[in-house]
Amino acid sequence: MTQEILKNADIIHFLKNTYPGTGFIDSLKIKYRPLISPFTDLIQKVKPAEKVADIGCGSGQFLLLLSKFASPSSLSGFEINPRLIDNANNLFSTIPTGIDYNFSLFDGVNFPETLKEMDRVFLIDVFHHVPKAMQETFLKNLCSSLKPGAELVFKDINAASPLVYFNKLHDIIFAGEIGNEWPMEKVINILQQQGLKIIEQYKRRIYAYPHYTIVAKK
């Protein structure tokens, strides 16, 4: 299957047929998240043979999709929740991807040294879950942990849209917390202050969810 014809239906079919039972809530988030998040756009940003990392990788859903629908040379996931790391390792150990992979715990503030080896780093709907007092430090630390030439793909929910409250309700139901979303422009300002060049930026509403995506190069 080529990336040009990738559809949400392809992604959902793949997830339903590959994911083991991970609990009711986790299963909903894993198998049906592509309906409300622009995964097809994000997957197609990966270039052949890139070393790819996903920060806040959860149970490995997005990296599994990259192993199926893209052609990275390696996949690395970083996560603060050991239960989710176990989910991801169990998943990848039972599905032969033919791609080198690694899942690691981190403390949510200090990024592993291996991040400096990555060509492309994804941060997908994670930033608004970072504690408010730590968000700017988190973002600056992330920027300093990228190697020259690496690209950061930053996807989150736009606080400048009144529809942000639908995402807050979503997070209460599925995460048990209220996130702290930022406007896209605020994120761009921080990235530029840290010396990154913005090469792509766009907003996209899916149902009631006001997404934005930024691609920035170190």
Residue ranges with predicted function:
Residues M1-T22:
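N-terminal, positively charged/glycine-rich alpha-helical extensions of SAM-dependent methyltransferases
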Residues E136-P148:
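A short glycine-rich, Lys/Arg-flanked "PGG" loop and its adjoining helix->strand segment in the class I
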Residues Y32-P48:
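Conserved alpha-helix/loop element of class I SAM-dependent methyltransferases that forms part
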Residues F122:
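A conserved beta-strand element that flanks and buttresses the S-adenosyl-L-methionine
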Residues L15-I36:
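Class I SAM-dependent methyltransferase Rossmann-like catalytic core
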